[in-house]
Amino acid sequence: HPALEHPGHALLGASFRAGFLAHVPRLHGHRHCQRHAGLRRSGRRLDDGHFWLSEITDRPNKGWDAALPRICTWGHFLDLQTKRRFWFFNLHMDHIGVQAREESAKLVVAKIREMCKPKEFVILTGDFNVDQNNHIYTTFVSSGILADSYETAGRRYAPNGTFNSFNPSLKTDSRIDHIFVSPSVRVHDYGVLTDTYRTETAASGEEIKSGAFPKEVSLHSYDARTPSDHFPVVVRLEFRR
């Protein structure tokens, strides 16, 4: 869709139905399928593909006790400034099946070891459906090949966790959306962006007059909403030569 296009970038991943795109890898059965929203700058891609988070990785299916088929998309790139190669993985682990999350984590770490050379940088992102206190999280950070960018960032802005259930009033310390990177990647900044937008209510047309503020200030009551049930997570990182 033109609204989702970014100049100089293209979409990566498996496309099962034209016109449907999910920002997080998601598959609701075979009738409502997906295309991943991995972005790349044109001219940098070396290769790309995907595998299913399952015992059978090469075709759509549900793995272990998962409620839905789940997938991981990857891209292999050449950084034009450093001339170093790097890999980008994006996944969505199951929200119901505990075993599926456990085995998916092991599978992804094994795939990274299998596919990526030791000196190539790795970035792994997505909705993991496990927070930083869950034992499955340690599968990634204890692997020796991945670090949590939240922990290694030079500067951090995280006024909330990453899941909001479409309710901007909720507060949590849980981060279930992660950006893992190779330990050698320098993370300058990490942020959870908690911006909201406003929608009208029945009372929006009435100006609020009472309060300790200048009379020229015009205030109206609107409902705060989040564009997603997850907050965006952003990092600024550097590949060291």
List the predicted regions and their residue ranges.
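Second-shell loop/turn segments in exported
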Residues: 24, 90-98, 123
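Structured beta-strand-rich core segments of catalytic domains in phosphoester-bond hydrolases
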Residues: 1-87, 189-193
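Structural detector of well-ordered beta-strand residues that form the stable sheet scaffold
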Residues: 13, 39, 89, 123, ...
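Metal-dependent phosphoester-hydrolase catalytic domains
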Residues: 99, 103, 113-122, 130-241
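Short, solvent-exposed loop/turn segments at secondary-structure junctions
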Residues: 22, 42-44, 53, 80, ...
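Active-site metal-binding loops of divalent metal-dependent hydrolases
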Residues: 91-93, 126-128, 231
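Preference for bulky hydrophobic residues occupying beta-strand positions
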Residues: 75, 91, 235-237
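Divalent metal-dependent phosphoesterase catalytic cores across multiple superfamilies
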Residues: 1-13, 100-118
